[in-house]
Amino acid sequence: MFEHISPTQAAVEFFYGLLMAMTLSNTLRLALLGSSPADVVFIVSVAIFGCNTAWGIADGAVSLLTSHFQNMYYYRKVKQIKEGADLEAAKELAAEVLSEALTELQEDVLDAETRRHMAELTVRSIKRQEISEPVVGRSQWMTALWCLVMNVAAALPFIAIYQLGLFLGLNLVTLIANVAGAVLLFFLGRFLDRRLGDGNGRTGVVMVGLGMLMLVIIVALGG
């Protein structure tokens, strides 16, 4: 899985999917007051599945296009370096490309000597290599597919919980769905902790707080 989509991107997709499902379950429950439990269960379930699927498709398409455009951006930069006759200009461009990602967190993470050395090695390597124009490949399609999968996966627990509305009060079912959402948010934060952090659990608590705050804001603004 993570050879195609990063843990962070997977977590973000699942987070958005949870927010979408929780928002729909709360807003539609209010909008359908007075409807029969069977109607509420059906409408909420279809809406959550449909909206999360649509969001997953849209986000997957955006991910695919963004990845391709980013690859094209770097391809043009590398092509400029390869075809450039001015060696110093090529080194400056190489240093710019190499340091873009590394200096995102801290501008001075690379000193001048390191930049110069990296640029020289990069220019030499690029001059020797054949540069192929990037195309949309299998990995990018798989990333787009995982965006869809993560959004749909986030919807399934809420669809399952709302089936209880045929047997339990709908207010209780909505409460159970919200509690389940908070639990999923916590474990999503724990997942990020294990993958990217120090595993102290704070990210889980932060994720619950952030998710619930955003849910309240979204519902208050009309969903």
State each model region's role:
Residues 1-58:
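Cytosolic-side membrane-entry/anchor segment at the start of a transmembrane helix
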Residues 8-19, 131-182:
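Transmembrane alpha-helical segments and their cytosolic interface motifs
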Residues 32, 63, 67-75, 163, ...:
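Transmembrane helix-loop junctions in multipass membrane proteins, especially transporters and channels
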Residues 45-79:
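Hydrophobic alpha-helical membrane-embedded segments
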Residues 46, 50-55, 181, 185, ...:
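Alpha-helical transmembrane segments in multi-pass membrane proteins
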Residues 74-147:
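Cytosol/matrix-facing amphipathic helices and coiled-coil assembly/linker segments
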Residues 187-212:
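Interfacial loop-to-transmembrane junctions
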Residues 215-223:
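Juxtamembrane boundary at the C-terminal end of a transmembrane helix
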